[in-house]
Swiss-Prot record:
Gene name of this polypeptide: rqcH
Family under the similarity heading: Belongs to the NEMF family.
Name of the featured protein: Archaeal Rqc2 homolog aRqcH
Superkingdom: Archaea
HAMAP family: RqcH_A (MF_00844_A)
One Gene Ontology cellular component: RQC complex
């Protein structure tokens, strides 16, 4: 059963992670489980929405994009806080595998320069944060080896490189390196040599041997056999690079391995195929991590049950003692009554003797009269507390009962018997109380067991709950709304501004632009239909509300519209247009002092109920449910929480809300 991805797997993972390039890091979380640690980086990709990148070290070592919900700590650990401090809104510009090893570097671009996050997926695993000069800022784990140290302020050194990189097999020198390695290591099994030359695990080394039809244990290969192995290696890696069939391999209905291609070793075993290797890796490890979390929860519940069972054991021991003591006290009282006259005579004799002589004399007389029918009953005298201990017996139901009975010489036989009965009564009252406590403890244990089973099922269900990634329509990549039946889209940044104008603006569309630096283009998709004045006024409000003016707290600004043919990417002579910027030539149709008025609500559009923003008049006319917003410094997370509660009946999640809100902060002004 696989617990960590191989360097072959890493190659496939890194290839598929390239879709994250140009994404920006939003938050970093660190989850500590009993056996492993997961670093989760929430990355927002311009045209792909938010994704969660998981780097896991410990027992389970892997990297993937996850679709599974995880319970994140409310207070992030220091390593996660450090990444948030340095990499907040940093652009992910490069992801690379180092030397076909289990080492991946994530390059982030910030205003202060380039930073790197290195994931090492061998040994116990590690995650190391570097500056642009490869100096370690902080590792998740401090480690020391003979060849390198992973400690702050030291230069990061990569693990030793393997002789041959699978990416370079097409070069003629690759075969020479491969052949020389075999010829220089005669006497070693070929499967071991393949593993060493490429730095790959036994699974893929054996696959190469099997494809070359050469016994994996064979030594001293001929050049022809070496050539066969090399060709089989090329064939295998070509399949890994270009013709994957991502899959989870099952054994006895349990997840056993996750691999990117069909392997001869797993021929005949059940397989579950996927569209991407990342998805397969995500599903595979989510299964095992759930078991770890559930096992941890189970351990907590079992400890509490064990604690209650210890309480129950002590209660039962106490109950047993109370019952035994109550019975003994009852018997002693009964024995006094059964021997009432003897006891009374004895007590009187002791009291009378005490008036005439000291205790030493009395004890001597008793010792000298061991055969006396009454004095002979006395076993001991505790003169300090006025107690004598006698042995009494009586026949009850043909059974002789005999006990040592303590008597208070200051009391008569009746009073001594009543004293024992009173003790028995008090103990019986305690028995009733302890029996009630025992029932409550038993009930608590049963409730814990039942609750534990339910909580474990709930925990398992929650841990295994896979987030359904909504299939977003093309326009949901941007800010968008629907005004009087017209679809309106707006850019969110320089990248989406450029995409909208170049890819999604047709010749009959109308393009708005707020008269403030950095404002997004807002496009009315007319589909050749005439747009009335009311619609233009509403779109004008939408365009200014999604500009920087909202963040700056302006009440109104100018905006204008133009036709697509007036927009050009050709700068004036001697000028340069940066990304997202265009030149507008010709007449501009202005809407002066357009108020920033915006709300958020749900609308039925394109066969679904969606959340988006719109000016008040449009909200009232077309939206199912809505609220008005105003610029504010209120924490965005709190606003999202409030809006999620308002629209809870429509299946709206946090990401849906965050995608549509205007730039900067806001708060609800009217529900």
């Amino acid at each position: 059963m696989k617990s960590e991805i191989t360097n072959v797997d890493v190659c496939c993972v890194v290839d598929e992670l390239q879709n994250l390039i140009n994404g920006r890091l939003d938050k970093a979380f660190l989850i500590d489980n009993e056996q492993n640690r997961e670093l989760i980086l929430k990355i927002h990709v311009p045209e792909g929405g938010s994704r969660e990148l998981v780097i896991s070290i410990g027992k389970y070592k892997y990297i993937t994009l996850t679709n599974y919900e995880r319970e994140k700590p409310k207070l992030p650990p220091s390593f996660a806080m450090l990444l948030r401090k340095y990499l907040k809104n940093a652009k992910l510009i490069k992801i690379e595998q180092v030397n076909f090893d289990r080492v991946v570097i994530f390059h982030f671009e910030t205003r202060d320069g380039i930073y790197k996050l290195v994931a090492e997926l061998f040994g116990d695993g590690n995650i190391i944060f570097l500056n642009n000069e490869d100096t370690i800022i902080a590792p998740l784990r401090v480690e020391r080896w003979s060849t390198r140290n992973i400690v702050p302020k030291e230069k990061y050194k990569f693990p030793p490189q393997k002789p041959l990189n699978p990416y370079n097999l097409e070069f003629s020198i690759a075969y020479e390196v491969f052949k020389d390695y075999f010829l220089n290591n005669k006497g070693v099994e070929c499967v071991r040599l393949i593993s060493r030359v490429f730095g790959i695990g036994g699974l893929y080394a054996e696959e190469i041997c099997e494809r070359a039809e050469i016994d994996k244990k064979k030594r001293d290969l001929s050049e022809e056999e070496i050539k066969k192995l090399f060709e089989a290696s090329k064939n295998l890696f070509d399949e890994i690079f270009n013709n994957r069939k991502p899959q989870i391999v099952l054994k006895d209905n349990e997840y056993f391995d996750v691999v990117p291609i069909d392997l001869k070793k797993y021929k005949g075993l059940e397989k579950k195929y996927y569209n991407s290797f990342l998805e397969a890796v995500d599903d595979y490890f989510a299964k095992f991590l759930t078991k770890v979390v559930v096992k941890k929860e189970k351990s907590k519940i079992e400890k509490e049950i064990e604690r209650q069972e210890n309480i129950l054991r002590r209660q039962l021991e106490t109950l047993k003692k109370y019952k035994e003591d109550a019975e003994k006290n009852q018997i002693k009282g009964d024995l006094i009554y059964a021997n009432y006259q003897i006891v009374e005579e004895l007590l009187n004799a002791i009291r009378q003797a005490r008036e005439k002589m000291d205790w030493a004399r009395i004890k001597k007389i008793i010792r000298e009269n061991k055969e006396h029918p009454i004095l002979g009953l006395i076993e001991n005298i505790n003169e300090n507390i006025g107690e004598i201990i006698i042995r009494l017996k009586s026949e009850v139901d043909d059974k002789v009962i005999e006990e040592r009975v303590s008597l208070d010489i200051r009391k008569n036989a009746f009073e001594n018997a009543e004293s024992y009965y009173e003790k028995a009564k008090k103990l019986r009252n305690k028995i009733e109380g302890i029996e009630n406590a025992i029932e409550l403890t038993k009930k608590k244990i049963e409730e814990l067991k039942k609750k534990g089973e339910e909580e474990l099922k709930e925990k398992e269900s929650m841990q295994m709950k896979k987030k359904i990634r909504k299939e977003r329509k093309w326009y949901e990549k941007f800010k968008w709304t629907v005004i009087n039946g017209f679809l309106v889209i707006a850019g969110k940044d320089a990248i989406t501004n450029e995409i909208i104008i170049k890819k999604y603006t047709d010749k009959d569309d109308i393009v708005f632009h707020a008269d403030i630096q950095g404002a997004p283009f807002t496009v009315i998709k007319t589909q050749g239909k005439e747009v009335d004045e009311e619609t233009l006024e509403e779109v004008a409000k939408f365009s200014v509300s999604h500009s920087r003016a909202w963040k700056l707290g302006y009440g109104a600004i100018d905006t204008y519209w133009v036709k697509p043919e007036q927009i050009s990417k050709t700068a004036e002579s001697g000028e340069y247009l940066k990304r997202g910027a265009f030149v507008i030539r010709g007449e501009r149709h202005y809407y002066r002092n357009t108020p920033l008025e915006l709300g958020v609500g749900v609308i039925e559009y394109d066969g679904d109920v969606k959340i988006t923003t719109a000016p008040p008049k449009t909200l009232q006319k077309s939206f199912i449910k809505w609220v008005l917003l105003k610029p504010s410094n209120k924490e965005k997370g709190k606003v999202v929480k409030e809006l999620k509660e308002i629209f809870k009946d429509y299946g709206i999640d946090d990401e849906d809300i965050l995608r549509v809100l205007p730039p900067g902060g806001c708060e609800i002004v009217k529900k």
